[in-house]
Amino acid sequence: MGLRLPFFRAGLVGALVSSSAAAQSFVREPLPLAPGARVLTITEPGPFTEPGIAIDPRDNRRAVGVYQNQATAAWTADAGATWKTADGTIPPNYRVAGDVSVAVDRHGHAFVGYIAFDHTGVTSYWALGGTRGGLFVRRSDDGGATWAKEPSVVVEHPETKPNLPWEDMPSIVADTRERSPYVGNVYIGWIRYQVDRTVMLFSRSTDDGRTWSTPKVISTEPGLPRDDTGGLVGFRAAVADDGTLYATWSDGRGVVFTTSRDGGKTFTASRRVIETAPPYFNIASFSRGNGFPNIAIEPKSHRLYVSWGDYRNGDIDIFVATSADRGRTWSKPTRVNDDPPHNGKDQFMQWMTVDPADGSAYVVFYDRRGDSTNVRPIVVLARSTDGGRSFTNYAWTDVSFDPRESSFLGDYNGLAALNGRVYGIWPEEAQTPAKVENGRRGRNTIIRVGVAEFPLKR
């Protein structure tokens, strides 16, 4: 879980806050800029982390971005030139919300999934002894501008009791494939922390997100009860043209994989398919890094991609493996970042997507190759047009930033692509002094959105 107390409702901008490179003293490291690259800041400085983004499959000028503090949504209808912050996504009955994710269905309905609660658990471990809470989904019928008055409940623990399970890190996905027999289904998976274990849960909606099935355990083997000592973490899913649902997560030692071919009713036994280093690791100048896997699919060919980060080379790199046989076998890992191996420079917090229009695979990540001190990252976008065998790296941000004031940027970012247009969303440490209130320095991160324009591969 990426939430860090204390939480507060910051004053959010209702429209675009443009970035100012003049206030920063570092220049872009020598990578080519992504084609048509634009990067905008959509929040004021505050406690903002863990964003996600989704594109309207009918129109790639329209997209919805989400992030915490709380469960906040912003939307664009002009290919990311301007963004507006939506009202009505914050849960009314709980003190805190977060771990937000977003999907958009074939009709342009947007879905935001998030957890909500009053307090985390004991100081020694946040998931133990927490208060009442649950997992909720809110729907927008107009591309993110307005949201349903009441959220739908996936699972809820309405009263604080000893040893309540903790629902964490939901990830939501919509079946938008016109040839799928389950088109219109919406799926959500998440971690449940219990006193003695972690398990991966799943629920589905067949009525446009209004109601949700009883949660089911889809992890064949449970994990340890803490995320930083071998717990299960990072449910992610992708849908093929025929409606097959593929899902991954980390079990602390590798990528775990499972499949549903009946619209989320049943799943194959989950199994580890790729060996990796543990997903949580220390990174200089950060509180921690997270390398848990992300899955994407080229829907027509069924080629599966899994990306992750680990330190097998002595510093942190980004890797991708692919499967051409629906997950039965997997390729050897391809190193995505193209700086020299073993150079002591970290790349981390990857996210992946595949453009369904042409099968191009994209990975976004923080990259510190250009800083001799291995502190200041830029944001890099990598593209593969050969089925994941190689990646071209592009700079998406003009300048690096210093993360040391905040040190915590969350556990994940967001990426989406359609018809050559790529949207990314990530937090950065604002390069202006943090506000001090009541003698305490406030959190000072901002949410940024990048757009790039690539020609479709032939």
For the regions a language model picked out, list residue spans one by one.
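Extracellular, repeat-based ectodomains that mediate carbohydrate processing or recognition
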Residues: Q24-R458
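Bacterial N-terminal signal peptides
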Residues: R9-S19
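Bacterial N-terminal signal peptides that target proteins for export
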Residues: M1-G11
